[in-house]
């Protein structure tokens, strides 16, 4: 039987329990100017409301909304260990906006979720500044978010991140893979590094190698290469779709599952892919990871982007003008394979 005790005469506050409302308010005021730089004319409200407002009227004739949500995996753990908080927000935005871009959609607005045990205003500001910058660079409004201070839920100095994006595309321009045909060409666009995938394996290899942060990888410190922000493909790809929409039958964002499992997601079930592994040279960081981790080729292909962050599935007679357009925007690219009709169950062949 539970015995009731006399209540303490010492008054308690929410701050005593570990939640500092004043710190949260200070954070909001600090990030307001950063967030406003990402706003678009369609944004109808500022920060602080119960719901964020976005006016879609007049922009599309027959809009289809495309939504996506993601995190940054255990790259976040590495960022916290290194005390590098200002670019992980760019990763968060990129993982979401690059996904919705695949269907030809323009990212409209973004919301973030930041959770921690004890709110550190400087750390949170650095993280959200990266989110705001990523949104600004994608033409996507950071329209709202949630900062959750939850005592006892996270160890000191740790936090978690999630993002949510809404995009729109004219129904007639929606890319769903249905136009893909045998003989279509795969154009691979360069990544900035591992982006935000495979970091549980990367961290294991890095730690097993003795955490060689300063190791020179072709003129760049290893840790700088590993922490390079995920490339934001939105603006150049939207521009490409505007000028060459008939040339592109499908697109793929190379994330978890690597080249093996992502491109095939946008290919009709009766077709497959032949990827030429010699069509491009994997960046040195992937060569180091494979060597140091003694990774099989198959493990590389299904874990990492291996230097290809985004793929266009294009009609063959438009490859040259697409390549020129990509060159004009400074995007390194290669013809990495073709769509074919498979015999048997193997739909993806890399060799």
Swiss-Prot record:
Known pathway: Purine metabolism; IMP biosynthesis via de novo pathway; 5-amino-1-(5-phospho-D-ribosyl)imidazole from N(2)-formyl-N(1)-(5-phospho-D-ribosyl)glycinamide: step 2/2
**E.C. number, please?**
6.3.3.1
Q: What is this protein called?
A: Phosphoribosylformylglycinamidine cyclo-ligase
What is its EC class? ligase
Instruction: Give the reaction(s) catalysed.
Output: 2-formamido-N(1)-(5-O-phospho-beta-D-ribosyl)acetamidine + ATP = 5-amino-1-(5-phospho-beta-D-ribosyl)imidazole + ADP + phosphate + H(+)
Note the Gene3D superfamilies from the entry: PurM-like C-terminal domain (3.90.650.10), PurM-like, N-terminal domain (3.30.1330.10)
Classification via InterPro entries? PurM-like_C_dom (IPR010918), PurM-like_C_sf (IPR036676), PurM-like_N (IPR016188), PurM-like_N_sf (IPR036921), PurM_cligase (IPR004733)
Q: Name one GO biological process term.
A: adenine biosynthetic process
Keywords noted in UniProt: ATP-binding, Cytoplasm, Ligase, Nucleotide-binding, Purine biosynthesis
| Main subcellular localisation | cytoplasm
- CDD domains per UniProt: PurM
Give the family this protein belongs to, as stated in its UniProt record.
Belongs to the AIR synthase family.
Where is this chain's protein located in or outside the cell?
Answer: Cytoplasm
Q: Which molecular-function annotations from GO does this UniProt entry contain? A: ATP binding; phosphoribosylamine-glycine ligase activity; phosphoribosylformylglycinamidine cyclo-ligase activity
* Gene Ontology cellular component list: cytosol
Q: List the disulfide bonds.
A: none
């Amino acid at each position: 039987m539970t015995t009731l005790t006399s209540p303490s005469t010492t008054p308690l506050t929410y701050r005593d329990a570990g939640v500092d409302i004043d710190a949260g308010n200070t954070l909001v005021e600090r990030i307001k100017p950063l967030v406003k730089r990402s706003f678009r004319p369609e944004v109808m409200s500022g920060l602080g409301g119960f719901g964020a407002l976005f006016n879609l009227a007049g922009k599309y004739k027959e809009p289809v909304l495309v939504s996506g949500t993601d995190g940054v995996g255990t790259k976040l753990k590495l960022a916290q260990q290194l005390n590098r908080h200002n670019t992980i927000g760019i990763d968060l935005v990129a993982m979401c906006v690059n996904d919705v871009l695949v269907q030809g959609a323009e990212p409209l607005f973004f919301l973030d979720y930041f959770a921690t045990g004890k709110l550190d205003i400087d750390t949170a500001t650095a993280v959200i500044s990266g989110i705001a910058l990523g949104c600004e660079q994608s033409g996507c409004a950071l329209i709202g978010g949630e900062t959750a201070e939850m005592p006892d839920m996270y160890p000191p100095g740790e936090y978690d991140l999630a993002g949510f994006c809404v995009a729109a595309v004219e129904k007639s321009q929606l890319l769903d893979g249905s136009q893909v045909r045998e003989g279509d060409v795969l154009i691979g666009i360069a990544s900035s590094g591992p982006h935000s995938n495979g970091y549980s394996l990367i961290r294991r290899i890095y730690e097993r190698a003795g955490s060689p942060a300063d190791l020179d990888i072709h003129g760049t410190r290893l840790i700088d290469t590993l922490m390079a922000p995920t490339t934001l493909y939105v603006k150049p790809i939207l521009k490409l779709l505007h000028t060459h929409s008939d040339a592109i039958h499908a697109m793929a964002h190379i994330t978890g599952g690597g080249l093996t499992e992502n491109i095939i997601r946008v290919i009709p079930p009766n077709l497959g892919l032949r990827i030429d592994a010699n069509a491009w040279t994997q960046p040195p960081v992937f060569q180091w990871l494979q060597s140091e981790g003694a990774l099989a080729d198959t493990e590389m292909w299904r874990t990492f982007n291996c230097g290809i962050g985004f793929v266009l599935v294009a009609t063959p007679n438009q490859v040259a003008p697409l390549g020129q357009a990509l060159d004009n925007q400074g995007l390194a690219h290669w013809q990495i394979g073709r769509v074919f009709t498979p015999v048997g169950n193997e739909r993806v062949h890399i060799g």
